[in-house]
Amino acid sequence: MATNAGYLRCKEERKNESFFKVVQSINVSSENKRALPHDFSRSFTDKELSRKMKIRAQWGNSWEVGISKNPRFYFMEKSGWEKFVRDNALGNSELLTFTHKGKMHFTVNIFKLDGKEMMQPPQSRSFFASSSRIKTEQEENDIKEEVVVSSNRGQTTAAESKGRKLNLGKRAAKESQSSKRTEKVVRARSDYAGASSSTAAAFTILFKQGYLVFLRIPNSVSKDQVPDEKTVFKIHHPNGKKSWNVVYLERFGAFSGGWRRVVKEYPLAVGDTCKFTFIKPKELLLVVSKP
């Protein structure tokens, strides 16, 4: 039986110490906001914590950040931390997860406010302005091209029309089969459902390495489906034998306490497609498709 490399990597990551930070512009310089969690710090010796942290991003860039201690806690030194924040244009409530790889070396996963992970360094302001201008010009050209093509297309032949109808029919049949499979899973949990599968809200997330500790919910979902306060959700396995309580933190728009247990016991692995369907206001059915 073939081994899922992503699952093994994910399983190994769970053994490593990790913590998270949410970066806002108003607290970049705050010593409290640069603190290392107490439970995390006590996993290391004073000698280890006297070293500099080496933080490595997904795209290979790295930063060194010194660690200091006050009477209450260890914290990341301002100079190194501010450079890391500045280089990555952070400060808009990004969620960062830090995973210890040994000898105070850390990998960092950065998730933007919309829930998407940063997989490359941010570009300069001039680049964005240039890109925006190019994109606008390209869109205008595309519109002009579409108008010209449409005006020159003329009447569609009977063969082309018939071919399109056949393709549409095949696509509709395929989508219908997929819809029926989804409805079957939801009906299997109908004892929990407060609404039919056709009206149930759902969202899909591709599981990444950074989701081991926290899972950020898409903004569109959190605004429409999730209470604007700390809430406990129940996540159900489709086999009906497993369920987990997970804490949703409205400040971060993410599943927090209990989420690591879901990852471990479901289990989830890097590359999995995770579909969450609301079967009650505070209950979700999690269906996972393996790559």
UniProtKB/Swiss-Prot annotation:
UniProt keyword annotations, A-Z: DNA-binding, Nucleus, Repeat, Transcription, Transcription regulation
Pfam families hit by this protein: B3
Biased composition (Polar residues): 149-159
Region (Disordered): 149-182
CDD domains the UniProt entry points to: B3_DNA (cd10017)
Gene3D superfamilies in the record: DNA-binding pseudobarrel domain
Known DNA-binding region: 19-114, 200-291
Biased composition (Basic and acidic residues): 172-182
Chief location: nucleus
Gene Ontology cellular-component terms listed: nucleus
Compartments it resides in: Nucleus
Sample GO molecular function, one term: DNA binding
Entry protein name: B3 domain-containing protein At2g16210
Organism of origin: Arabidopsis thaliana (Mouse-ear cress)
